[in-house]
Amino acid sequence: MINTELFKEVSPLSAKDCFILIERQKSNFNFPIHIHPEYELNYIENAKGAQRIVGDSIEEIEEEELVLVTNPQLEHAWRDYNNKPQNIHEITIQFHSDLLSDQILNRNQMISIRELFHRARK
């Protein structure tokens, strides 16, 4: 059973950074439920059967997983579930919400990115 105690993650992303990239190799995939103000893009491979918890959605992930979180209050976590311990590869990119300004996101070529960010808030 997942620990439902929420914690606020402290990112190594500084005010002067555009983004940070964190790459990990691990044999299990447990990351407790948390929030943080940074936007976050997660790519995970080799964790088929693990569970992704984002907001009120709990789903088993596939062999490859790509998740974008753009809501600072959106609780999210991952946990071992039906996956086997193996060489799980995780790449996380965290960036500030103002990295892409409204001025840029309102350009015609950025409409789909703006919509993606909006959907990722839920």
Residues covered by each model-derived region:
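A hydrophobic/aromatic-rich effector-binding and dimerization subdomain
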Residues: 2-13, 71-122
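Generic protein-terminus/edge-of-domain signal
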Residues: 1-68, 73
